[in-house]
Amino acid sequence: MVPQTETKAGAGFKAGVKDYRLTYYTPDYVVRDTDILAAFRMTPQLGVPPEECGAAVAAESSTGTWTTVWTDGLTSLDRYKGRCYDIEPVPGEDNQYIAYVAYPIDLFEEGSVTNMFTSIVGNVFGFKALRALRLEDLRIPPAYVKTFVGPPHGIQVERDKLNKYGRGLLGCTIKPKLGLSAKNYGRAVYECLRGGLDFTKDDENVNSQPFMRWRDRFLFVAEAIYKAQAETGEVKGHYLNATAGTCEEMMKRAVCAKELGVPIIMHDYLTGGFTANTSLAIYCRDNGLLLHIHRAMHAVIDRQRNHGIHFRVLAKALRMSGGDHLHSGTVVGKLEGEREVTLGFVDLMRDDYVEKDRSRGIYFTQDWCSMPGVMPVASGGIHVWHMPALVEIFGDDACLQFGGGTLGHPWGNAPGAAANRVALEACTQARNEGRDLAREGGDVIRSACKWSPELAAACEVWKEIKFEFDTIDKL
């Protein structure tokens, strides 16, 4: 039997557990241009110093583990470790801090949102020393941005494909979201597009259920698109949801959409996953399809103020993974969304360069290096009376999506679409003439009603509908 040898301290290894602060809390660190920066809102367990928690976040999301290990000596931890370089208390909150962590770019695989998130928002969110942890923002350095393909086409190319300029785009989610046959579904699509909408949409739950298999839906919808285009002389589209149980099935549906000649398909990027989304985005770029992205499941991740991931991070991740549209909330509808916060991440979706602005929740300056922008989609509980606010908030580069606000019109689907189109064009013209939509929007809509009986009927139906609930996630 070989006798056990004693480990000498001079050999460079000492077993045991040491404070994360000794290695991963580095307040003197000078951030590099190539570092990925993260801002975490952390709530330590009672009695745990914030410096220890910040260091633990940096360690557990990069090179650290709970004890000293032999193999630390086989690499350069100083080169690869994450560093908590600053901690600041959250104003007005007890025992909450913003911890800033810098990650060397070499920790992440090029062009992989999946790998980036696996590290930064992985096991660390279950760490016992933390009562709660939320990723508020990420700074993606240009060196890493350039490894991503990004949106298949972007806002300008989409406008060129559609030949639609100078106004926002109009959409509608077909309702009821589940239960229609494929033929009746196609009929609703046709009526909405003929009435004046640019797009109609599959609901995020619509995949290939027994009442309507995907191939039947695709065929009837394609027929509706071509018929509406022939009658109106405008390019029309429908977001055909290609999301499926496997990537192979998803790609089969995308190929079918391409063969039918439709302009746009759709994916549920959070439930479908970033790997599937990036694969689909690359296919769409190579084959001339626009890609509409729905954010189903986002509120499970982003709605709680103290724990999870803020939507601005999910929006940045989608821009890197690839998508031409992304649902972003409405500010004025039925879904969660504070105005300044929403406008902050809308700018992060659309603009090429966004300055740090804590008043809008933007913790870092972000340079997208000419990566195409993503068009925000405002959807959820909106109707014609919201149109002035939507035009004022989002401007032209947005898709305004009225589901119930189209299909709930008392005269039917086509009149509902016409009402929305008249309201949009009236508000756009009023804005272009210098009128203040925030103050005069109601007058603009009432004036347009004189020339559009469809709009007048819609205004009468929804004149008392409001969604006045306080926003949970505030700055």
From Swiss-Prot:
Pfam family, one: RuBisCO_large
Changes after translation: The disulfide bond which can form between Cys-247 in the large chain dimeric partners within the hexadecamer appears to be associated with oxidative stress and protein turnover. The disulfide bond reported in 1IR2 may be the result of oxidation during crystallization. The electron density found in the position of Thr-471 suggests it is either O-methylthreonine, or Ile, which may be produced by RNA editing.
Active-site residues annotated for this sequence: K175 (proton acceptor), H294 (proton acceptor)
Superkingdom, taxonomy of origin: Eukaryota
GO molecular function, one term: magnesium ion binding
Positions contributing to substrate binding: N123, T173, K177, R295, H327, S379
Site location (Transition state stabilizer): K334
Primary location recorded for the protein, binned into one broad class: plastid
Residue(s) carrying N6-carboxylysine: K201
Proregion positions: 1-2
Subunit description: Heterohexadecamer of 8 large chains and 8 small chains; disulfide-linked. The disulfide link is formed within the large subunit homodimers.
Protein purpose: RuBisCO catalyzes two reactions: the carboxylation of D-ribulose 1,5-bisphosphate, the primary event in carbon dioxide fixation, as well as the oxidative fragmentation of the pentose substrate in the photorespiration process. Both reactions occur simultaneously and in competition at the same active site.
Protein name, as recorded: Ribulose bisphosphate carboxylase large chain
UniProt organism field: Chlamydomonas reinhardtii
